[in-house]
Amino acid sequence: NEFLPKNRLIVYTEGRNSPREEYRSNGRGNVQQMPIIVLVDEISASASEIFAGAMADYGRAVIVGDESTYGKGTVQIPRGLADYLPYFASQEGCGMIKVTVQKFYRINGASTQLKGVESDIVLPMSTAALPIGEAEMDYAMPYDEIAPAGHYVKNPHLARILPELRRRSAIRVAGDKDLQYSKWFIDYRRRVTEQNTDSLNKEVRRKEDAELRRIQRANDEERKPRYAAMAEQDARNFTIYRLTLDDVQADKLPIASKDDEDKYMESAEDPEEALEDDVDYPSNLDPILREALHIVRDMMDLR
């Protein structure tokens, strides 16, 4: 509603025994002209996929993150099992089941089921190492398509600049030590998952664990001075505001402080658990958020 004009189609639902239903924007549209990045990963599901799909179909936003989202494109309703018992039977403890009755369909006619929403720019997300998503589920419903909405118009601007956005992002990712480490760790986790075996030899396991900890410690040590320099540069280049549910209605957003960050800090009692968590991201911007900021800058530069 904030990103589209009034009465724009957002998503269809359609089922075997139910008519097509349309869901449209109410047209508040306070940020219709600003460049938008939608960050997604393989855990982004259902409503977040509907949002990402609509923004992509209208050419309103660049989708950034994992190769695709989760792929949960079905609608369920609860059915009480007591309704199926004999009239005078006890209904105590009958419970209920969720029955799939419809699918979601994007404006372009594609279902979000199974395939999800594909990213325009793929980044090395931590979730990429995990075998998750609707496609990994047993008996998942298939992907399908219906006729696209005949009256929607996609803004062609993002499609024109997308090749250049991808080129610039790829150059930055190739030179970003944090994102390259993420790519290494994704490949490592995939190898371990595909191998699907663990040695029963205690010494072998100890050597494997020690090598992984060595790599993690070396990565942490490399990051500390680099992150300190990045934080100083951020202080010169950025003004970072705090935005929480308490601040949404405020006339002016407060400046973010270190105290705000400390509220969300994680603590680890085990020194080994502290690996990779004891080096704070500069300005609370992880590598994915930082690259997303660069992409937004590119979008503004190419307008």
Describe every region a protein language model picked out.
Residues 1, 53, 290-298:
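A broad, structural surface signal
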